[in-house]
Amino acid sequence: MSDINKIDMFKNDVRYRENIAHIETISAKKPSFKKIDNLNEDIISYLESKDVKLYKHQADTYEAIKNGENVIITTPTASGKTLAFNLPIMDTMIEDKNATALYIYPAKALSNDQLHVLENLENDLDIKITPRTYDGDTPRKDKKAIREKSRIVLTNPYQLHLILSWHHQWSKFYKNLRYIVIDESHYYKGVFGSNVAFLIKRLKRIANFYGSYPQFILSSATLANPRELANRLTGEDFYLVDEDTSPSGEKDFILYNPFHNYKRNKVNTQNAPSIHMETENIFMYLMLKNIQTLCFTVSRKTTELIAMWAKKDMTQVKGKLAHRIAAYRAGYQPQERREIENGLKSGKYLGVTCTNALELGINIGSLDAVIISGYPGTMISTWQQAGRAGRSNQKSLAILIAFENQLDQYFMNNPKFFFDKPHENAIIDLSNPILQEAHILCAAKELPLKRGEAEKYFSVSQNVLDRLVDNEDLNINHRGDFMYPYDDNPAMDHSLDQISSEEFKVMNNGNLLETMERSQVYREAHEGAILINKGDTYVVNSVNLSRGFVNVSKETVDYHTMVLNKTETNIKKKLSKTKFGDLTIHFGELTVSEDYFKYKKMHFSKPIGTYPLDLPPLKFNTKGLWFTIPKSVKDTLEDMFPNEEEVFAGGLHGAEHALIGLFPLHTMCDRFDIGGLSTNYHEDTQEATIFIYDGYEGGIGICEKAVDVFVELLNSTIDLLNNCSCKSGCPSCIYSPKCGNDNKPLHKNATKYILEYLSKMISNNNHGKKEEIIEEEIKNSNDDEFSDAYELYQKGDYSASKDVLNNILANDKKHAKALALMGKILYDQEQKDIALVFTKKALSADKSNELANELEVLLTSKSSMSSTFELNNLDDVDTLYEEAYDLYNQGDLSSSSEILEKLLDFDDKNSEALALMGLIYYHSGIFPKAIEYYKKASKINKNGEMVRELKMRVS
């Protein structure tokens, strides 16, 4: 039987055909070729020896690069992108014996794969380019030779981030740098992409310093905004090559919905089969038809499970095929991965389950079929994975198996959207202040930063530099240049994968299990949580928020945990408003407070217990969009559903969930990258309001892009609800897996009414008109909090008032009212020495503050304080320090740190105490904190005994 017939059999099999939501037959395509005039003779000979004719898009790429253009090429997988940019680079290498090129890949496996391609080109063209990879696995003994002799170096952003400050060792390479190649550039989005964009700007600055102005060559999967991405990533303008002229075989792309009959017949989907077991059934079916299949899954654990089940079942059915099944994922040894890759190419393996580790362009040859178990999060990933089948001209098969969530079910009901032109926008945000400051520090470490360079390379204003100087993070030298004044490398403190440098260590019996950010600790690793790592379950026993530790123990349990939280938002500043007909979408800066107050133990989907949490609120500043719903909508809904409670609130909540659920359709993000809040009444807007915000400190550009595509987002969301046949809401429409309110209240019909009301507002004329709002301060949330603190003070609740004041001062250290009130509380509590410290800080911030002036008179009068500064032994600074130092020497780091915290609360300029705290963090393995405390201590006194010892450790 031919492969075509075998593939067609699946579509008609009675076991599967009722769940097929759509079949898209993608026609075979013939190639289109183009000759290049004046092609280098060596390259002509090479192409003829390989019997290669250049496709038109390859020739177009070649010509654009040789004409000096920056080029981004966005043709599909297996269309010959690599050859398209390698040939002009080789041409330059032949012409200029000193020319160099830097290839940047997001993954080591890709670097190694492309290294072999370049080595073969070097041999076939008989030129000396000595291509080498330079990453964390490169032996130290080889690094010097690579820096001095290699003309093409392949690396990844993480390695480049760390070695840029050693650019003097690469001076010859940078002096002759002609090309920077960024492969798989669609990978650079969100936090990682924004960090890499700043990294590329640092790289450009160094190249310019050595006199080179390299061309950029980017390759990418198909995007809605390729030129915008390329420009954001590099700061350059680009020539786009997006016409695919390579041949391809016919492909059937099947959208497969295991929930199809359940939803059509309105049967509870809890009775539906396991998606993973359904995936394994289809995987087995194809292998038994001798169809070589690659099965993509959403997690490492699922990859292993499906391979294990398939091997077990195949042993029972056709034992000789069981050894031809394998799993492939990150975490395997390199030689294991190479063996599976080669086994796929040779046909040794008939079926392989994998994570997205095989999505990128690693060469595994041609396959007959691909199964995609669950939408992988982006259309780019989906088509990259589907492109693994049918690399030659034979017919192939791709099957997307839907999960029950909004995105997967939307595609099942809207195949035209799925197969239509690209909708996804890759987002890079260069306005995040935390990222700006982190990379400015790195740049100043690499080379003194001249006035004007911050704006030229990083689009950062002079105000940012002044703030860094005020904070003593930068110094100004005699030439007026900005310099990083410390011995450490700030790149070591800043991860490219996150915004915050704060890191928590998850420890199991003294061994490091993983690291995570504070927000992730609150969501996944709070006390009592079940943490899953590499398929094993761990119970969180304790969390130390001040020292950054999470202690867990490995236990086998039959439940998981789900945290609940209450969210509050305050509008800090409006930045713009966009009119869509009669609907106004606002965009601006928000302050978000998330209170994680309890968690539930869940056995599958059934709650088996609820437990309180005692965590301080998680507060952060971000950017988001919001819009209001008039009271008339509430009145109408209450008339429509007179006997139901919380109809309006349920509709707002459902609209928020549904919109967020489809954000990834239009902006390349994960739904967990964004948060939301809906409320019947918001103090800042005076109306019912829906907020949607970036879930990252400072914002990352997701909601800003969402404003531009809001009409498309709204229409998609309405389609989603209209095509979902459930009665009152389900995971396919308005339920959210991350809802902190336990998906309550929700009302599907009210949700539909609200969304359709918004659509009617938009249908009027003049939509899409954006107005910038210059520095409009809507509300200062600190002033509101101060009012709360003052009210608590008047009631005599000093402890609660101080908690609120501490929150204010964490955001604004110079909030004069908060400083003065803290001083007054301390004065009333007879802590007059510390009260004086806060009073002086308040007067420094605002000399006219009445309360601070009154306090100063009281605190400096002889009747209030004795002329000598007296403290009892417990509060005596020297005594406390000696006690902490003795405990440190005895190895009691925990007790020592507790005493130091008390001391530093009183005297935060004690350099020896700061350094001793840094040493405790160092010995605890929390190196970023150790470096942070060294910086604080060395700014005060570089020559202190403990400061010098800490410097020796952190250096």
Question: Where are the model-predicted features located?
Answer:
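Helicase motor core with emphasis on the C-terminal RecA-like subdomain
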Residues: 11-49, 59-60, 66-82, 87-157, ...
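Extended Lys/Arg-rich polyanion-binding regions
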Residues: 395-398, 404-418, 439-451, 467, ...
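Canonical tetratricopeptide repeat
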Residues: 821, 855, 916, 950-953
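Start-of-helix register in tetratricopeptide repeats
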Residues: 783, 817, 850-851, 878, ...
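Register position in tetratricopeptide repeats
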Residues: 794, 828-829, 858-862, 889-890, ...
